[in-house]
Swiss-Prot record:
UniProt family annotation: Belongs to the WASH1 family.
One Gene Ontology term of the molecular function aspect: actin binding
Assembly, per entry: Component of the WASH core complex also described as WASH regulatory complex SHRC composed of WASHC1, WASHC2, WASHC3, WASHC4 and WASHC5. The WASH core complex associates with the F-actin-capping protein dimer (formed by CAPZA1, CAPZA2 or CAPZA3 and CAPZB) in a transient or substoichiometric manner which was initially described as WASH complex. Interacts (via WHD1 region) with WASHC2; the interaction is direct. Interacts with BECN1; WASHC1 and AMBRA1 can competitively interact with BECN1. Interacts with BLOC1S2; may associate with the BLOC-1 complex.
Biased composition range(s): Basic and acidic residues: 390-406
Pfam families xref list: WASH_WAHD (PF11945)
InterPro entries: WASH1, WASH1_WAHD, WH2_dom
Name of this chain's protein: WASH complex subunit 1
Pro residues bias locations: 302-318
Amino acid sequence: MTAVKTQHSLAGQVYAVPLIQPDLRREEAIQQVADALQYLQNISGDIFSRISQRVELSRRQLQAIGERVSLAQAKIEKIKGSKKAIKVFSSAKYPAPEHLQEYNSVFTGALDPGLQRRPRYRIQSKHRPLDERALQEKLKYFPVCVSTKSEPEDEAEEGLGGLPSNISSISSLLLFNTTENLYKKYVFLDPLAGAVTKTHTMLGTEEEKLFDAPLSISKREQLEQPAPENYFYVPGLGQVPEIDVPSYLPDLPGVADDLMYSADLGPGIAPSAPGAIPELPAFHTEVAEPFQPEREDGALLAPPPPPPPPPPPPPPAPTAVVSAPQPPMSPDVVTVTGKVAREEDSGSGEAHSASVQGAPKEVVDPSSGRATLLESIRQAGGIGKAKLRSVKERKLEKKKQKEQEQVRATSQGGDLMSDLFNKLVMRRKGISGKGPGTGTSEGPGGAFSRMSDSIPPLPPPQQPAGDEDEDDWES
């Protein structure tokens, strides 16, 4: 007798107990019953042994957890009476292994004992002859439900099918304004070509037409989008009672005395800021204003006058003119010319000393660098108070100088008054920085040197009237 292999009904099922087949001979039925019971006993023993091993493994794991709990409890009891603060550092990651252990089934590695080779038995008895009456008797004990109804043949449907339940009148069965029953035969009428019949197969081959657009497109209606539901867990603090207690209570059981609630307890494990970032001081911006000196009573002082021009260079030597010997000058004329020269020299010296004494320190001693130079320019009033001359004024002045030179050349007759006038003009040119050798080119003398050009020239000398003077010169 060979073992009957049975297919497993469930995926992953290891064991499969064989069933005893009907209509067996007596010896054959007894042999299969004995084999099935022995197979069931082996399976039961294997199952219970595996369950016992898994229970023992779980018991050892539980014992290890209990040892860890007892160790933690002993540490808690040790530090329970301490009054010093204890730092507890928690790991930034969850304390779990990198690779989790996969779950192993209880029946991992189990083998089906039915696949083992068993001894074969030879039975001498023969099978009984087939008896139909005996088979009919078995139907009483083994009911068999067999469907005897024949399946209906597929009939060609030509109409719309069965009548709907909501039809209230016979006119609803007929096509509009016709006598055709569409539920019996589907047709459509054409007033020109007549009635055309469509079968069920023709209806199936027709192309499906698009349905009408929804109201949101046809009527331009906008559907309101429902608000998404939030399933996040947001715990609430609830009502917290207000407790008025002192800030420090000494000698409390289980409370440390050296508690420190600050950010200087040490570097944290997690990469986070130790505390709030301190606020930086605010800087006030000031607008630069020109320097304005003030008096003690708070009134503003006028800016100092611009520095005067440098002292005049020594006048050039007059050109020698060959002429006839002239009579000696009278003492009155000599004294007049001496007084005029001394007054001009003294006036220019006093003006220079006053200008040096009245000038600001930044101009007199420009040793403080660029800031001092800018400050002195601001105090002097800048380019707006320099009184610069335009090109037209220069051209007009040059014309006047040429005319004066022509008049001087014509009036130069060798007398004493014309010579004195020429010397005074040369003196004025020397003061203004325009010597006879400078020519028409004008160097960068500065705006203040041009201010002296605005001094009006002396009037031309007048010829002395009277015959007495002529008589004196002739004598």
